[in-house]
Amino acid sequence: TRTPVNVTVTGAAGQIGYALLFRIASGHLLG
């Protein structure tokens, strides 16, 4: 069974990963 804590941690990791990916993509676009 999935626990709220596990979902929260996964969600936080997803947000951080998405933000990091977006920042890296912006860096490549800007050069």
Swiss-Prot record:
Name of protein: Malate dehydrogenase
Catalysis performed (reactions): (S)-malate + NAD(+) = oxaloacetate + NADH + H(+)
BP-aspect Gene Ontology terms: tricarboxylic acid cycle
Family membership noted in the UniProt record: Belongs to the LDH/MDH superfamily. MDH type 2 family.
Keywords: NAD, Oxidoreductase, Tricarboxylic acid cycle
Purpose: Catalyzes the reversible oxidation of malate to oxaloacetate.
Residues holding NAD(+): 11-17
EC number from the UniProt entry: 1.1.1.37
SUPFAM superfamilies hit by this protein: NAD(P)-binding Rossmann-fold domains
Species of the source: Streptomyces atratus
